[in-house]
């Protein structure tokens, strides 16, 4: 527990030697004291984030992991300018042991980043974001204690949302405008040799 922020971490077994969890969080609370200062009565500044992880050992050769991250930052100056952004990530990973020298990881990852600007003086706000889906398959092969080969496939689908601009009052001169979404796919094969 700190003066302007605190963090919490909990971890432990759900089922002994099979399933475990981790939960962590962090948050600031300085904004709760800002109203005590007369000149900054309408200002805000805070953040929070949460981390979660669940692991389950299916058998001697297979373990699955599910994890997530959620975070947000907010900065508001007397309702004149408001900035808020956050990210959400979910990750599923399957670890498979082929032998004591070869193992693989199959991962599916979802990420969503959003950003909001509210221009109080200009009476409009702007919301934008980036979403991506990532599928990757990695293998590691230990030839001996000194030599390791890594190889795999990776593909990412992107959705870029340049934003929605909209008036916040009836008096605003800004017109509603939805900017066109953009899409992209990035795929790769990689290999490396570590000695």
Which positions does each model-derived feature cover?
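Short glycine-enriched, charge-decorated loop/helix-capping segments at active-site entrances
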Residues: 37-41, 80-81, 122-125
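Face-selective signature of the C-terminal outer-membrane beta-barrel domain
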Residues: 55-72, 84-195
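Short amphipathic alpha-helical leader/targeting segments
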Residues: 24, 80, 165-166
């Amino acid at each position: 527990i700190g003066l302007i922020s605190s963090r919490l971490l909990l971890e432990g077994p759900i089922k002994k030697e099979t399933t475990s969890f981790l939960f962590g969080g962090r948050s600031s609370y300085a904004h709760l004291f800002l109203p005590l200062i007369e000149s900054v009565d309408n200002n805000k500044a805070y953040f929070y984030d949460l981390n979660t992880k669940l692991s389950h050992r299916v058998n001697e050769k297979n373990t699955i992991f599910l994890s997530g991250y959620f975070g947000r930052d907010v900065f508001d100056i007397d309702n004149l300018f408001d900035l808020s952004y956050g990210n959400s990530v979910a990750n599923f990973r399957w670890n498979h042991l082929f032998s004591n020298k070869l193992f693989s990881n199959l991962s599916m990852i979802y990420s969503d980043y959003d950003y909001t600007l509210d221009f109080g003086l200009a009476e409009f706000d702007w919301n934008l974001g980036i979403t991506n889906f990532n599928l990757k398959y990695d293998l590691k092969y230990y030839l001996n204690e000194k030599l390791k080969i890594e190889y795999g496939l990776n593909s990412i689908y992107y959705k870029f949302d340049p934003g929605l601009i909209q008036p916040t009052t009836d008096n605003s001169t800004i017109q509603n405008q939805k900017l066109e979404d953009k899409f992209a796919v990035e795929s790769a094969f990689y290999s490396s040799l570590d000695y």
